[in-house]
């Protein structure tokens, strides 16, 4: 192999090893970062739903209670759980991969009843009152999913409808009956907010970023290799070829060649000086032999 080919081969091997190491580290970093961003997005959406629930309970419900038909007609819009769920469903128009549920062990609406894995989360919050959030992964029929969960505790406003059945609004009783959603206790963990998103969503983001990173690295390497090759050719290879060509002519007896012009003070210049001294010494020696 010629010098340029050897140099390129060395750079390609070094770049390949470096790329292998960088790809392993960067992929893991990008996957973790995408997962963290997904969880943060879920946390913001959950906070939005919780704010809607609090607003409904503290601001909207007291106003609706003053309307003339409130006592005769059940309005689901006055239920904080309902308002939070509707708000999140509206957010899902922009984030369709996210799902939200306010799961409860004893809900009024059977739709909100916790599944087994959701009940386990609620039980964990009950047994660990200092915990305010759980992040985990679980298997689903369509693949793994990341979930973010925060506890829901019964407030004084909740007990107006979910305490004793006798104290509940008649319109609620007529709509849902008395079998579910009663007997809650103040500050008791009665459910959990749960946001789920398929694991493939953050992984897809990470892998797209990873492919883009590899593309940029490859382009940068090729551009760097091209610049190095051009510099190596004009700074090292071309002067060496000229020296080799002149040395070949001199070795064949052509002593009419002029001296090389020395440019710079680098190693190539030193080789050129040495060649000139050798060439001049050879000319003197040949003249002495002729005499």
Predicted segments with their positions:
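Extreme N-terminal signal-anchor transmembrane helix of membrane signaling/transducer proteins, especially
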Residues: 1-28, 215-216
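Extracytoplasmic ligand-binding sensor domains of the Cache superfamily
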Residues: 48-54, 58, 62-155
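HAMP signal relay modules and closely related sensory coiled-coil linkers
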Residues: 238-250, 257-280, 285-286
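Cytosolic-side ends of inner-membrane transmembrane helices, especially those
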Residues: 23-30, 220-237
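Short, hydrophobic beta-strand elements of compact beta-sandwich sensory domains
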Residues: 148-150, 164-166, 184-203
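The canonical Cys-X-X-Cys-His
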Residues: 154-166, 171-177
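Juxtamembrane membrane-water interface segments immediately C-terminal to a transmembrane helix
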Residues: 25-50
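Membrane-interface helix-start motif
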Residues: 169-183, 199-216
């Amino acid at each position: 192999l010629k010098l340029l080919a050897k140099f390129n081969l060395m750079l390609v091997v070094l770049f390949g090893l470096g790329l292998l190491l960088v790809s392993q580290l960067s992929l893991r970093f990008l996957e973790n970062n995408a997962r963290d961003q997904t969880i943060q997005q879920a946390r913001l959406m959950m906070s939005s739903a919780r704010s809607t629930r609090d607003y409904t309970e503290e601001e909207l419900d007291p106003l609706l209670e003053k309307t003339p038909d409130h006592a005769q007609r059940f309005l689901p819009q006055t239920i904080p759980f309902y308002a939070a769920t509707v708000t999140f469903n509206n957010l899902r128009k922009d984030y369709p991969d996210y799902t939200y549920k306010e799961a409860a062990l004893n809900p009024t609406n059977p739709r909100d009843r916790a599944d087994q894995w959701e009940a386990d989360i609620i039980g964990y919050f009950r047994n660990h009152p200092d915990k305010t959030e759980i992040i985990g992964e679980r298997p689903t029929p369509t693949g793994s999913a990341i979930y973010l969960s925060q506890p829901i505790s019964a407030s004084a406003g909740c007990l107006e409808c979910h305490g004793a059945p006798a104290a509940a609004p008649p319109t609620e009783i007529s709509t849902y009956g008395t079998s579910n959603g009663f007997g809650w206790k103040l500050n008791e963990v009665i459910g959990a907010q749960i946001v789920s998103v398929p694991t493939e969503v953050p992984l897809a983001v990470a892998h797209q970023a990873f492919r883009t990173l590899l593309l940029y690295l490859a382009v940068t390497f090729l551009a760097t290799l091209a610049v190095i090759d051009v510099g190596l050719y004009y700074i090292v290879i071309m002067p060496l070829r000229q020296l080799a060509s002149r040395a070949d002519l001199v070795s064949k007896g052509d002593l009419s060649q002029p001296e090389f012009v020395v440019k710079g003070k680098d190693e190539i210049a030193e080789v050129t000086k040495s060649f000139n001294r050798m060439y001049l010494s050879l000319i003197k020696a040949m003249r002495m032999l002729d005499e």
